[in-house]
């Protein structure tokens, strides 16, 4: 899978094709993060074939739809449990991100894993994504923003104006 652009969250439901032995096969639902619905269906078959004796040729997709965020204007903390294949083996990992949407946090995770661990998108498997309360956060990178009186430093900038003289009688004001 190529994690191109912002990933979207899809709910994919599939099952085995009905046979004379099993008229109503069980449905399997997955939460897939992918750039589009075609990749989401492909990832569904990849994961389901690892878990159950199911293949695309002997199964069908019952439903594939995009899941939209309930509150996309509120900043939330997300905990992501994942496994990834590195050059030395398979590792489990727990990461925390702060974002507006679940899909945004997962996209951030894919970018971060590529930057920090050189892990490509195809070697990362997202196991669980959960919104977590501020008190349950463990990572200092996320916890630093949980201050109600948070302040950000104003940069001390020297603006060189194009059409003003270099030498003048008054000192410049560089505090904005």
Swiss-Prot record:
Keywords: Cytoplasm, Isopeptide bond, Phosphoprotein, Ribonucleoprotein, Ribosomal protein, Ubl conjugation. The modification Phosphotyrosine is found at residue 63. It holds the Pfam family Ribosomal_L18A. Its main location: cytoplasm. There is a cross-link at residues 11, 128, 170 (Glycyl lysine isopeptide (Lys-Gly) (interchain with G-Cter in SUMO2)). It is found in: Cytoplasm. SUPFAM superfamilies: RplX-like. One of its GO terms (biological process) is response to antineoplastic agent. The modification N6-succinyllysine is found at residue 76. One of its GO terms (molecular function) is structural constituent of ribosome. GO terms for cellular component: cytoplasm; cytosolic large ribosomal subunit; cytosolic ribosome; postsynaptic density; ribosome; synapse. The modification Phosphoserine is found at residues 71, 123. Component of the large ribosomal subunit. Binds IPO9 with high affinity. Component of the large ribosomal subunit. The ribosome is a large ribonucleoprotein complex responsible for the synthesis of proteins in the cell. PANTHER family: 60S RIBOSOMAL PROTEIN L18A. Belongs to the eukaryotic ribosomal protein eL20 family. This is Large ribosomal subunit protein eL20. It comes from Rattus norvegicus. The lineage of its organism: Eukaryota, Metazoa, Chordata, Craniata, Vertebrata.
